[in-house]
């Protein structure tokens, strides 16, 4: 299920604009077709989620689809 897209990356913090409201704090998200990029949701606002990367963010790009 597609959750949204990455809108910013700062060190290990990743901001995701949400397409779905089914996301909860503590959920683990990953980049579609790249399971090595996984994040834990730590904060949710009306339209976005702030996540902390569980691995390196090297090679991660803005606009990547998150599921």
Predicted regions and their residues:
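Acidic-enriched and Gly/Ser
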Residues: 1-10, 15-67
